[in-house]
Amino acid sequence: ESADYLYDPKPSGTRWMHSHFGLQEQNLLAAPLIIRDKAAMQEDAQEVVLLLEDFSWTSPEEIFANLRKPKKMMSMGSSSDKEVGPDLNDVEFDAFLANDRTLDDPEVVAVEKGGRVRLRIINASASSNYTIDLGALEGTLIAVDGNPIEPLSGKTFPLAIAQRADIMVTLPSDGSAAAVLAHCEGRKMRSGIILAPKGATVAKIATMTDSEGPEIGLAQELQLRAAAPLAAKKTQRRIPVHLTGSMSSYIWNMPIEGQGGMPAVVSAQQR
């Protein structure tokens, strides 16, 4: 059964759809949802969508049960001089996927020699952050979470869980292939795809690296500027939201202050 709907698709941009029922997202129930505006459709660039996911042979229910088991407490009187690093990952995944594939058999996308490519990258992982590594390519970040920004250039870009990044790249004029890699935060594993013009040599890329993926911080976030920012307007209302939770029970909450668990009611155009 099918149905046709006519509507104004706003907002446009790189979006994604995924289940919020139980733990289905960990079972890879997610897909890209790309809404193109007129400018994107008229753009002189090839589009390549990259969906990143983390995968485990262990069932999501068992993973969640293990996370909620009582944790061993570290002795405060420990004589060890070893520095304790940040707790970056709670789940040991078996693989990291780029468009459903690992680097053992990556997707090879046909592109034009010297052509422009708009990468629409989606972090659909349940519990993993990444650093996007363009290797020898120089990229220009033009949109984040589907929203256009003032261009930001670089070779690496952090991508947190559920985030999206639109990155423009220009392929080498010599016709060589280029890899777009996603290195998992705090892990030596990575995934990615290959952009390859006709006749290009596609070299084998190892899944494992010598070093762990870097910790994701807020440095890039602080540089982001909206291409079309909200109009200046005095704040009319403030709604405090608390981030709470417990590692021991693995329960996390975002209660709105003073609402007793009820939603805050707002009105249209209210700032």
Across the structure, where does each feature detected by a protein language model lie?
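Solvent-exposed beta-strand/loop surfaces of large extracellular or lumenal domains
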Residues: 1, 134-161
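Aromatic/His-enriched, Gly/Pro-containing loop or helix-boundary segments
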Residues: 1-16, 20-22, 153-158
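Non-cytosolic beta-sheet module surface loops
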Residues: 9, 21-23, 122-125, 134, ...
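Short, conserved beta-strand segments of beta-strand-rich sandwich/propeller modules, principally
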Residues: 14-16, 118, 177-179
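Extended terminal and domain-junction accessory segments
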Residues: 27-68, 149-271
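Acidic-aromatic/histidine active-site loop/patch
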Residues: 48-115, 122-125, 244-246, 250, ...
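Structural beta-strand segments of beta-rich domains
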Residues: 115-119, 270-271
